[in-house]
Amino acid sequence: MQNIRIAAMIFRSVSGDVRRNLNAMVHWIKISKNEGAHIICFPELNITGYSNLKEIKNAAEPVPGPITQDLSNLSESQEIVILAGIVEKDDKGHIFSSHLVIKPDGFVGVYRKLHIAPPEQDIFTPGNTIPLFDARGVKFGIQLCYDAHFPELSTHMAIKGADLIFIPHASPRGTPEEKYRSWMRHLTARAFDNGLFIIACNQTGENDKGLRFPGIAVIIGPSGNIIKKILSNKERLVLADLKSEDLDRVREHRMRYFLPNRRPELYDFS
């Protein structure tokens, strides 16, 4: 991978108010660009807002569509890669919790959440593919919130060549400190066991549908070390420089990079 500056956003989304959320994104994208960021990651469903109520379907849009066009124009003008969450509706009427990858050259990619938490299963359809994306000299995967609790997904992405995994969340309830303790039970292990960077961020504040989100953003190194974190109930931007030498230091060490010594012929997950 190449050295890269990443921005992760603690962001307040109002459920169903797409225009308001997009306008707020513009502000932070411009700040990120001025700070030298190459990629900015927003939380899960930050554009449409998060809700496990069926009314959230009213905010669903196709991909590509008007939202992706707006973001493509913004990505091109600011010369920054944008990762952002949307309720997506396909041509068969299926509803997905999706995360967009918008590049300045016009590329529009999409990751559809694979593992749907029980309270969301009446609304969202699970995705069925595990895409990886290339941007600014790095290869990365995306997982959305509940996805991160399935460790084999991170290992799959690492084996397929991911240097980092973005894990946007829309995870309500609790304080930022409580959410941080919860994330540290598994996110550091995803980074350490697979020798890659993890970038995780959450929504914050009230969403106008009865949910409150504890603001948190964490960037974790391939040794499982915390590179940077912010806990805040206000919108905040977390910036970090991810260095190829930190990744190489782990992956070239025979006792710190575990994946080459896997025994997949012994594992039966069926």
Please place each PLM-identified region on the residue numbering.
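Short polar catalytic/cofactor-binding loops
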Residues: 10-16
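Short, acidic/polar
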Residues: 20-29, 150-155
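Short beta->alpha transition motifs characteristic of CBS
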Residues: 48, 100, 111-117, 218, ...
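CN hydrolase (nitrilase-like) catalytic-core segments centered on the catalytic cysteine
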Residues: 66-83, 149-237
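Active-site catalytic loop in hydrolytic enzyme cores
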Residues: 90-167, 172-185, 249-258, 266
